[in-house]
Amino acid sequence: MQLAAIIVSLVLTVVGVALIARAIGQFVRYFRLGQPVPAGTRTDNPYQRSVTLVKEFLGHTRMNRWGIVGVAHWFVAIGFLTLPPTLAQAYGQLFEADWVLPVLGGFLPFEMYIEFIGVMTVIGIAVLMVIRLLNLPSRAGRKSRFTGSTAWQAYFVEYVILTIGLAIYVLRGLEGALHHVESYEAAYFASYPLVLAFKGLSVGVLQNLVYFVAMIKISTSLIWMITVSLNIDMGVAWHRFLAFPNIWFKREADGGTALGALQPMTSGGKPIDFTDPGDDDVFGVSQVEQFSWKGLLDFSTCTECGRCQSQCPAWNTGKPLSPKLLIMSLRDHAHAKAPYLLAGGGKTMEGEEKASEEQLA
């Protein structure tokens, strides 16, 4: 069991790391296709921007407006950030079943934190899954905020999180049994029932179970990594990474809503002088590459949650307009067009093809 678990886990790790590195490179090239923004408009006051990022993430200031959905999502988000140490623990357990993290392993506050977050992540994702199932488009039609969203991606992400959360919980129970936890204690305050359930098993069986569950945990994480790396337009997964720069680069450094006076129209990152416009100035957007890099980042960060759609008067009165579907369409078009643009393709202002036949071959 141990050898199989090691081989499967390490093979998936090599593939996953290679693909995620490639995906990061694709994102960098993709965002560079966007137009620049006026100098300093997205990078002014870096301290305040960093404060806003921490406040909006830890406080979930936007999500918590949605009640139980916001609370459940907060625990899932914190659980995702807690994944690295638990993943490191699982890798160590592939080689030594009773292995613990250096320094943190056995540190009571950390052990209690893992217990608490592990359970709350499972509860949080279960709540979100139930909410999704109760609001399926097949049940509620247009009233469902999930109408038009890519269902398989959401289900995939939800079941991955659930599987990883359960694996952490089961591993905690196995660890307690292997470490001979004889009575209820704070370090296993949530997983102690599993410690009792595994207590009568032999050391050999416990070790094989640790190898197996650690493999499940690692494999699930790496399968998720491989899947999202092959689908860089999968906003429901990639927002876990892209949301951080998206918040930091908000229009207002203090996190204020981007309302008020219309921003000056720009071309190539510079305001257009309408009294004497440049010959190559582009007014507005007629091609997806004419959006700014921040616009492309916005498209890719969309989670397809449908909250904007649920608030849209046009959508709610039976019209085809939906802000969610608009953003999704722009995202999909931008990602589909990116290879062509990166190969040198595109149109001049006169409508002529920029790339040669050799470049597009």
Can you name each region flagged by the protein language model?
Residues 1-285, 324, 328-333:
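Membrane-embedded alpha-helical bundles of multi-pass integral membrane proteins
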Residues 46, 118, 155-158, 294-304, ...:
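Secondary-structure capping and boundary motifs in well-ordered enzyme cores
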Residues 126, 302-308, 312:
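The canonical Cys-X-X-Cys-His
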